[in-house]
């Protein structure tokens, strides 16, 4: 895979990405000031270190330019896999979560929460944060297409790491890894999988 200097993120070899359906993944949550927008070209490169640590590059994030993440389930028989997701696509699906636990955009967080997340994710610490852990499902889309069963949309629920995921998207990560049960991985790739800068 390409290994150019402008590549924005990394993935593991088993986290293959499928071409998703054509959808509008612009943010559905307004904010008083915009999140940093990815400004790059080229394709992601895959280069996890030997211990399986992922490094996610951030764009226009003054505090630090990258974040390290590790797997939640590291045992071979865990039946969970890593999927490299498009940040905007994943968060759009997460906004559809029917539960009451859907966080607002980062600019609406209390300043102490933003500071705490930033310190938690800062690289160079002994403890490496775990990647977000999600559940994925689909439902009928609004409108006629969904009514007749011809159109569906993805729904993401966070088991852990929603603050991390939303902060990464705000900080300019175009894509990042998440962990999901193997039975849901294919659908997650279809609706949210990273396929390049043009996807965002």
Please identify what each model-predicted range represents.
Residues 2, 13-15, 24-52, 57, ...:
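Short alpha-helix boundary/capping and kink motifs at helix termini
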Residues 3-8:
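Extreme N-terminal basic, low-complexity initiation segments
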Residues 65:
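Structured alpha/beta or helical-core interaction and ligand-binding surfaces enriched in interleaved
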Residues 90, 141, 163-165, 183-186:
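Short, solvent-exposed loop/turn segments at secondary-structure junctions
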Residues 162-174:
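Short active-site loop/helix that positions an aromatic residue
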Residues 176-184:
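ADP-ribosyltransferase catalytic core
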Residues 185-200:
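Amphipathic, charge-rich alpha-helical segments that serve as recognition/docking helices
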């Amino acid at each position: 895979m390409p290994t150019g200097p402008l590549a924005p993120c990394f993935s593991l070899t088993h986290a293959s990405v499928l071409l998703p359906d054509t959808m509008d993944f612009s943010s559905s949550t307004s904010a008083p000031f915009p999140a940093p927008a990815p400004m790059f070209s080229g394709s992601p490169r895959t280069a996890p270190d030997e211990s399986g640590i992922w490094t996610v590059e951030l764009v226009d994030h003054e505090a630090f330019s990258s974040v390290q993440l590790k797997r939640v389930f590291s045992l071979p028989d865990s039946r969970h896999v890593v999927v490299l997701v498009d940040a905007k696509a994943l968060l759009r699906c997460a906004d559809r979560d029917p539960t009451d636990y859907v966080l607002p955009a980062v600019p609406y967080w209390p300043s102490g929460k933003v500071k705490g997340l930033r310190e938690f994710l800062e690289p160079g610490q002994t403890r490496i944060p775990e990647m977000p852990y999600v559940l994925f499902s689909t439902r009928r889309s609004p409108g006629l297409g969904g009514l007749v069963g011809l159109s569906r949309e993805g729904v993401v629920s966070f088991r852990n790491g929603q603050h991390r995921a939303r902060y990464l998207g705000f900080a300019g990560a175009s894509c990042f890894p998440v962990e999901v049960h193997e039975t849901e991985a294919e659908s997650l790739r279809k609706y949210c999988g990273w396929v390049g800068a043009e996807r965002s």
